[in-house]
């Protein structure tokens, strides 16, 4: 498989009802599989996914391992060239995967990438969490493209060109599976 889109869930049936449809509708590519990794939810998330989206594969974890622990355990169950860790509250748009897959296929030296994230409240502005990748300034202070402190920029196309960043957001993180595991996965403490 080329790409596994993995959505970590814990008691998030309402988020899945709201956002999973766009992921399913706009991720119809060859060699792409969508997974919901469930962190031992007690709501009816699993039942809803099974009945509403039978082609979405479920990975059922035995307890709530949190973000990093949940992804690490779920990804061990998946064989794929790339993983795309996607928050359950992300709405994707048509053709969102093609630039990510194309870039990673052309740049074997790149371990991970992310799409541009726009705000759900105002799609002309960047999302506060992650926006367009992160940096560390010369004083060691972290900041994101698209946001400085509490000021979020309007999207005027200024970040449409790929750029090497210090980190990519976990809200929509595409990573080469071999590099994910060579790095030891995510730190389970987070």
List PLM regions with ranges.
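A conserved acidic beta->alpha catalytic loop
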Residues: 13, 22, 38-47, 63
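Short, acidic, metal-binding catalytic loop of nucleotide-sugar glycosyltransferases
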Residues: 21-31
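Glycine-rich, basic loop-to-helix element that forms the pyrophosphate-binding segment
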Residues: 60-78, 88
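Short aromatic/hydrophobic "clamp" motif used to bind/position activated sugar donors
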Residues: 83
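Conserved donor NDP-sugar-binding/catalytic core segment of glycosyltransferases
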Residues: 91-141
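Cell-envelope/extracellular polymer assembly enzymes that use nucleotide-activated donors
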Residues: 2-4, 33
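A recurrent flexible, glycine/aromatic-enriched loop bordering the glycosyltransferase active site
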Residues: 138-144, 149-178, 182, 189-190
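Short beta-strand/loop segment that forms part of the nucleotide-sugar
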Residues: 31-40, 59-61
């Amino acid at each position: 498989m080329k790409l596994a889109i993995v959505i970590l869930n814990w008691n998030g049936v309402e988020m899945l009802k709201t956002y999973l449809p766009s992921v399913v509708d706009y991720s119809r590519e060859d060699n792409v599989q969508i997974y919901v990794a469930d962190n031992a939810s007690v709501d009816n998330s699993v039942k809803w996914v099974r009945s509403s989206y039978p082609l979405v594969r479920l990975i059922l974890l035995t307890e709530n391992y949190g973000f990093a622990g949940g992804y690490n355990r779920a990804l061990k169950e998946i064989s794929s060239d790339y993983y795309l860790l996607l928050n359950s509250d992300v709405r994707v748009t048509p053709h969102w995967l093609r630039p990510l897959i194309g870039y990673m296929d052309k740049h074997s030296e790149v371990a991970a990438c992310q799409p541009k994230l726009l705000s759900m409240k105002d799609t002309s502005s960047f999302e506060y969490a992650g926006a367009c990748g992160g940096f560390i300034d010369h004083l060691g202070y972290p900041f994101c493209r698209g946001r400085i402190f509490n000021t979020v920029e309007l999207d005027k196309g200024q970040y449409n060109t790929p750029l090497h960043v210090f980190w990519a957001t976990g809200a929509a993180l595409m990573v080469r599976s071999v590099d994910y595991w060579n790095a030891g996965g995510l730190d389970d403490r987070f």
